[in-house]
Curated annotation (Swiss-Prot):
Keywords: 4Fe-4S, Cell inner membrane, Cell membrane, Iron, Iron-sulfur, Membrane, Metal-binding, NAD, Quinone, Translocase, Transport, Ubiquinone. One of its GO terms (cellular component) is plasma membrane. NDH-1 is composed of 14 different subunits. Subunits NuoB, C, D, E, F, and G constitute the peripheral sector of the complex. NCBIfam families: nuoB_fam (TIGR01957), PRK06411.1 (NF005012). Belongs to the complex I 20 kDa subunit family. One of its GO terms (molecular function) is 4 iron, 4 sulfur cluster binding. The keyword Signal does not apply. NDH-1 shuttles electrons from NADH, via FMN and iron-sulfur (Fe-S) centers, to quinones in the respiratory chain. Couples the redox reaction to proton translocation (for every two electrons transferred, four hydrogen ions are translocated across the cytoplasmic membrane), and thus conserves the redox energy in a proton gradient. This is NADH-quinone oxidoreductase subunit B. It comes from Herminiimonas arsenicoxydans. [4Fe-4S] cluster binds at residues 37-38, 102, 132. Its EC number is 7.1.1.-.
Length: 158
């Protein structure tokens, strides 16, 4: 958080936008939407070796408690309405991370009749994490990119 000025009396001044965005980046609660093998890497990123808790990332089981959705794996046509329904149940502000080649653009199954060619056709995606499957480090980098994106947004309308 950028501090605008520190006064001699011990006060810290900053803008409300920067304060709100600082709290949002330090307490991101993702809801996992694991569909295929990328979900294993997502679980690996949440385990003790990578420990996403140090970034303020705590996995939540309910869409009403989460503000980030991680779509990991192959999205089929049959699962697309469920993805949209879960996304609509999330409270604002909400963000989406697309994890893996299949979630990004269909991946290996791109030409299959039953595969959605990218989850961005169903929900708006903020960060794309490439790979088949992407490593836990790649997901952590994607989370850091999302935190940078949140820091740059204007929260309070002017």
């Amino acid at each position: 958080m950028a501090i605008e000025g520190v006064l001699n009396e011990g006060f810290v001044t900053t803008t409300a936008d920067k304060l709100i965005n600082w709290t949002r980046t330090g307490s991101m609660w993702p809801m996992t939407f694991g569909l295929a093998c990328c979900a294993v890497e997502m679980m690996h990123a949440g385990a003790s070796r990578y420990d996403m808790d140090r970034f303020g990332v705590v996995f939540r089981p309910s869409p009403r408690q989460s503000d980030v959705m991680i779509v990991a794996g192959t999205l089929c046509n049959k699962m697309a309405p469920a993805l949209r329904k879960v996304y609509d149940q999330m409270a604002e502000p909400r963000w989406v991370i697309s994890m893996g080649s299949c979630a990004n653009g269909g991946g290996y199954y791109h030409y299959s009749y039953s595969v959605v060619r990218g989850c961005d056709r169903i929900v708006p995606v903020d960060v794309y994490v490439p790979g088949c499957p992407p490593t836990a480090e790649a997901l952590l980098y994607g989370i850091m990119q999302l935190q940078n994106k949140i820091r740059r947004t204007n929260t309070i309308a002017r």
